[in-house]
Every structure is written in C-alpha cells, then in structure tokens.
Amino acid sequence: SRKSMNKKLVPLVISFIFGFRMLGLFMIIPVLALQDDSYSNFNSFSLGIALGAYGFTQGILQIPFGIMSDKFGRKRLIYLGLVLFTIGSIVAATAVSMEQLILGRAIQGSGAISGTLLALLADTTGERIRSSAMALVGMFIGIAFLLGMTLGPLITEFYGMNRIFELTASLGIISILLVGAFIDEPKSITKNLELDIELTSIKSLFFDTKLSHLYLSIFMLHLSLMSFFLILPVMLTEDLEHSQQMLPIIF
C-alpha cells in the first residue's frame, strides 16, 4: 500500500532533506570570507555575524520547534521550517549589503527542524532499524559536506555567490515537495502536553553534568570547524596566492 511504501521511504526522504539543507549551508562556508567586493559594509565583524546568524537562530528555536511539533504535528512544523529556510535563502540571494545577508541567514536558521526531523525518524522507525536510519542521515550530511566544499568555490567562481543561495532555495522547495509526497503524519507521537513539565525537563537537560561534556565537545567541534574554514580560504588566496579555482581541489 501507499502508506507502507511511504513508511519505508521515510528514512531516505529525511536523509535527503538533511543533505539538501546542509549542502546549501556547506557551500557558503569556504567562500563567504572572500566576498568583500560583493556586499556593501563588508568587514570582519559583519562576516562573523553573517556566518553565525544561522546557528544563532537555529540554536534558539530548536527546542521551541520540538515542543510545537509535539502539539501540532511533525509534518506541519517541518513544512514551516522548510518554508522559512527557503525564504531566508531567497533573501540572501538578493542581498547587496551585509545587513541583508545577515537577515537572510537569520531567517534560514529560524527553520530549526533538525530535532523535529529526527523525532519524526524515531516515530516512524522500529528499534531494530533506528540506528541504521540515523546512520543514513549522518552519511548524507557527510556527503553534503564533501559536495559543499567542492561546489561552493566552483559556483562562486563562475556564477557568483548569489547562485549558491538560489540553489539552496531550490533545494528547499524540493524538500517541501518530498515532504508532501512521501511523509505522512505519524499516528503515535510521544507527547508531553504539560508546558510546566516540559520546561522543568529542559532545565534539567541544561544542568545535566553527563550531558554537559557532550555540549562542550559539540560546541568546540563546530567552533573549530567554522573558524578553520573562515580563515583557510583567505590564507590560501591572499597569503599563498592560490586562485579560487584551486579551492575545490585543496578542500
């Protein structure tokens, strides 16, 4: 039946959605620091804000999106997140100043559906295949990183930075279509409708000493990754005098 077929495809569809979103983000990382001629008011501070705006809104809204998906359904919140991601990509594609680019990146990040997608994956997969489904998501993110580091410099060199955001918006639209075609709202969702209980649970997560090591490790990993790919392209092109066309090969 269609429903059983869709259920089998859910892990693959969620992996594609993760991959599409991350591809659009990874393509930007190695080239944004080199776009000083593309945007007005470009400086080191505005560059850092533009890169960090996505993660800032993503981090703030991740838990609210998860709570709302418990109350209003996974599919609705995934739609909302992908629409925001697509709108943010369009805003960034049309940006001519760093302020506009920062706004676009912040809107992109406000579609904080990573947790909701993983919750949907847990809702629709049995315990036997759940680990494999999670591994599939990780594999697609890894492929997106590889492609993003390669395609980003190539697209920017030949077509311009705005084409990356246009491609990202297109991937957002494709993701919306995939959700409509293959994702059904799960019948059973683990819900906690008492807001005060939810807030207490969230507070305990922040102060859990065992989890704090994971929080710190993930924070340091992302900090070093973003810093590395922010500085390395500038070093390669300015200090070592490599052309931007060499960046895909080096990365």
Predicted regions and their residues:
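Pair of pore-lining "gating" transmembrane helices in MFS-fold secondary transporters
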Residues: 7-32, 210-227
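Hydrophobic core of transmembrane alpha-helices in multi-pass small-molecule transporters
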Residues: 19, 88, 99-112
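Short amphipathic helix-loop junctions that connect adjacent transmembrane helices
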Residues: 30-44, 231-246
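Conserved MFS/SLC helix-loop-helix module at the cytosolic interface between two early adjacent transmembrane helices
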Residues: 60-96
